[in-house]
Amino acid sequence: MPCPLSNYKILMNTPAQHAKFVKLTTEPVGRLVTGLAVPAMVSMLVTGIYNLVDTFFVGQINTQSVAALGIVFSYMSIVQSIAFFFGQGAGNYISRMLGHEDSHNAGIMASVGLVSTWLTGAVIAVIGFLFMEPVLLFFGSTATILPYACDYFTFILLGTPFIMSCFTMNNLMRHQGNAVLSMLGIMTGAALNVILDPIFIFGLGLGVKGAGMATALSQMVSFTLMLMLAGKRGGVPISLAKFKPSRQRYRDIAAGGLPSLARQSMMGIAALILNHVAGLYGDSAIASFSVVSRITMLASAAMIGYGQGFQPVCGFNYGAGKFDRVRAAFIHSCKVSTIYCTILAVAGFIFARQLVSLFVESDPEVSRIGAEVLRYQCLSFPLTGYVVMVNMYLQNIRRTVPAVIIAMARQGIFLIPALFLGNWLLGFLGVEIAQAVADTASFLLAIPLGINTLNRMGKE
């Protein structure tokens, strides 16, 4: 079977880059995926824990401050979607190029992806400052939440180019098999954020404004460190000299990045709609969903991290034409992620009230609503592992259309109608169960898309 990238010219790699190619295309896939997944899982867990710690500290202020985090989360999801578009799009291309031992084009693509991300983030930040209050109202803020949301949003906007660049760098490094170095950058930023949160929020008396300041500063440090580590351990170095944008390179980024853009954008849009629908039932409802979203993000972190360990294995071996290894890695990753999600779903269902109360103990109404929402989401959580792995697999092998469909399904195609219909038919109960309905429908859609593409791989 010819290599899918056989029309590309092979360029000389460094010994470290060739050694990495040999490792990713010959080592047993189960051990290989797990080895690459562990640092990615740690990075995701650290990020999830940071989000929870952020919520914990802000939760000590008042309900409106917690709700403000939920409002700005919609914005964060959208800018993350753009960062993932560049990071996953360029990263998928890079892993296939390195699978074909072409480090020259891989290095150019890495530079194009990162610089494009930073410039886009700067433009978004300027627009955000010009239209701050209308943007926050659009994202679902109420009049009582708006002052807190503005305080937090101000510093998030200042850090937007660096926040986005961190997400892009994380993806670029992971797709080269450098998850450990990426983990170091992510963990440094998260640890700094956890340290700065109580200092700024309580020590300096800045409140929710301090939480935004801590986030922006920590992301700047994280980005700087990852940029310094980019060319280590056989990674391709990034520099402005290699920033050579072209229509074809952006097409390649789009082919691999559109599914991530669709998934993350839908997450932001769904969060926006959820804020508006939940807002019909008061600030406590918005705060409840804000807390639960951070708990479920942490629960999903290790599962997504395991999928991120699968991605470079998939990309390298698909680029090298070793399709049996791609299939084996996919099946292994689906099994592990499903077992993990099932264990966490059971634990989350049993201890839902205790988990939510950790962050909003002072507001029993938020604790009650949040526990209900979390239990409903736990019912469908075991199904999400397979859906995520199918999406990552399709994205890495450049099956853009089915990958976009799967990416949009859980947070868009199914969740948004479920929110409106659920609210119309069942009231607040319908809003609470909307995510579980969307998860189940997405799983049913992913089954044929994943299996059919897996069976046809290498035969087309």
Feature locations, PLM:
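Small-residue hotspots at the loop-to-helix junctions and early N-terminal turns
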Residues: T63-S74, A149-F153, G212, D283-R294, ...
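Hydrophobic transmembrane alpha-helices of multi-pass small-molecule transporters
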Residues: I78-S81, N193-P198, S222-L227, L298-A301, ...
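Small-residue-rich hydrophobic transmembrane alpha-helices
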Residues: V66-V126, I163-S182, S288-A352, T384-I406
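Short alpha-helical transmembrane segments in multi-pass integral membrane proteins
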Residues: P2-A37, I94-P161, G203-L258, C314-S380, ...
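Helix-terminus/linker motif at the lipid-water interface of multi-pass membrane proteins
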Residues: L45, I49-A67, L136-A143, I199-L206, ...
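N-terminal transmembrane alpha-helices
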Residues: L24-F56, Q60-I61, S77-G89, Y93, ...
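Transmembrane helical elements of multi-pass membrane transporters/channels
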Residues: G35-D54, F155, G189, S218-S222, ...
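Short runs within selected transmembrane alpha-helices of multi-pass transporters and secretion channels
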Residues: G87, I156-R174, S182-A190, A211-T224, ...
